[in-house]
């Protein structure tokens, strides 16, 4: 049996992975998979792939691109979610910030540098015409850390996926003052260089099996209940979220979308000027088309 270490954020986007791992299909192909939730987000996932703690990781596109550019030893093998991600822009419920214009110059909570919460804070500020040079960041590790940071007044603003934080907005702990969509597809499947060299067939079998699971899941009449029960989300929130999300139906790399991501990050001086799409991607020839 080939052991495969897989990881991602504990969010509803990864429901197809959870169903695949529970199905026993991979074991029939001689693969023993394990899943780890990374509450710290994409920056932590990129480091885990580099360190050998993960073989396959599901990362935010912008974080994967920046991680590879900074020398992390993994590649993008496929887009996983083709739709963009809607980030909620949150402040503490008792904040003096009444609308999104009020967050300019405030302290941003981020899970870590290079994470989606970090990059999207910069993308948002740039889109609003604000200076990005003087943005102050407070590293809080994860959503739990963000709640603590807000509670003790250590930060003022926090970007996180809007439905993941909706229960905190509903309870009155957070207030959402705005939203920002990513200007590119949101999640990619990444494979460590070491895993691809040593476990190539297991990796490719797993990725192909995942997309079969994605298509079964999307055709399922129970998908709303599955997500609601597994991730403890309200049914109406899952229904609203599903209207805007689109998983990739098959393994694919979209060079134009990756170039858009590179260009966006270059415009913010977050990646090297000489970064090219070819630097980011793994060989796709063995994956089903």
Which role fits each region the language model picked out?
Residues 2-130, 137, 156-162, 174-177, ...:
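Short, glycine-/small- and polar/acidic-enriched structural segments
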Residues 144-228:
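Pocket-lining segment of extracytoplasmic ligand-binding domains
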Residues 197-272:
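Secondary-structure end/capping motifs
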Residues 266-289:
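Conserved C-terminal helix/tail region of periplasmic/extracytoplasmic solute-binding proteins
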């Amino acid at each position: 049996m080939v052991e495969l270490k897989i990881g991602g954020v504990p969010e509803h986007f990864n429901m197809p992975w959870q169903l695949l791992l529970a199905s026993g299909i991979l074991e029939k192909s001689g693969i023993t998979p394990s899943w780890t939730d990374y509450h710290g987000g994409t920056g932590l996932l990129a480091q885990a792939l580099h360190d050998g703690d993960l073989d396959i990781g599901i990362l935010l596109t912008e974080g994967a691109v920046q991680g590879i550019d900074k020398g992390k030893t993994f590649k993008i093998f496929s887009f996983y979610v083709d739709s963009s991600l809607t980030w909620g822009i949150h402040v503490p419920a008792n904040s003096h910030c009444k609308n999104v214009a009020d967050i300019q110059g405030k302290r941003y909570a981020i899970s870590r540098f290079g994470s989606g919460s970090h990059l999207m804070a910069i993308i948002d500020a740039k889109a609003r015409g604000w200076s990005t040079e003087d943005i102050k960041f407070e590293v809080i590790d994860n959503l739990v850390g963000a709640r603590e940071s807000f509670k003790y007044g250590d930060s003022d603003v926090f970007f996180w996926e809007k439905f993941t934080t909706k229960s905190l907005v509903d309870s009155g702990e957070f207030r959402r003052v705005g939203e920002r969509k990513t200007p590119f597809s949101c999640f990619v499947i990444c494979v460590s260089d070491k895993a691809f060299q040593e476990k190539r067939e297991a990796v490719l079998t797993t990725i192909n099996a995942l997309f079969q699971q994605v298509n079964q899941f999307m055709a399922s009449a129970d998908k709303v209940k599955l997500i609601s029960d597994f991730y403890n989300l309200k049914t109406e929130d899952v229904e609203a979220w599903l209207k805007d999300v689109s998983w990739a139906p098959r393994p694919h790399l979209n060079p134009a979308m990756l170039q858009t991501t590179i260009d966006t990050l270059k415009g913010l001086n977050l990646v090297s000027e000489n970064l090219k799409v070819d630097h980011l991607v793994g060989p796709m020839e063995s994956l089903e088309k």
